[in-house]
Amino acid sequence: KPAVKTKSVFSEQADQILYQIRRFGSKMATAYSMTQDSKTSGEQAKCLTLLASAERIFYDRLDDAIRSASMFDETEYNAFCRGSISFGDKEEAKKKKEIYDGIVSTVNKVVHDNERLILRLDSLAYALNQRSAQNPWDTDVVLAMTKLDTVISKTEEDIKQDEEISKEAMKRYDTLNGGN
């Protein structure tokens, strides 16, 4: 948290992330509570697995944002944007800009991914709360679980893709710094 909060470039995202953490905790507590009332052990097991995955993904993404923001040199970035400093030739400057843009993009993507996760979690909790006692496998619950599972899977794919992009960016960064 502090790494994101101390950099003005990320102040809006930091506020959103803090708000998301509070909401996520509340939604998880509600969903866990509603899961305890599940009518079948199959539904309960599926919900608990999804909730554990949602929690892992949410906090992994927060970790990504914090790590990315920690790497961000705001002083250098601001000087670069003002034109006070340059990084040699245009190619080096372009690579450096791509790195900065990538870090900002990662933090924004985490906020987006976690918001999407919270909304799906909310839908699941609502469906669990509204389900009919006569039909333990209420279609709304199944649909909400499926949508949450889809968001989790999509986010996991995005994380893998982000890791590949980061590896490439770090290779470029290493070449910029002479391999140090």
What is the predicted role of each segment?
Residues I66-N180:
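Soluble C-terminal extramembrane regulatory/interaction domains of multi-pass membrane proteins
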Residues P2-K90:
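Membrane-proximal, non-transmembrane interface segments of integral membrane proteins
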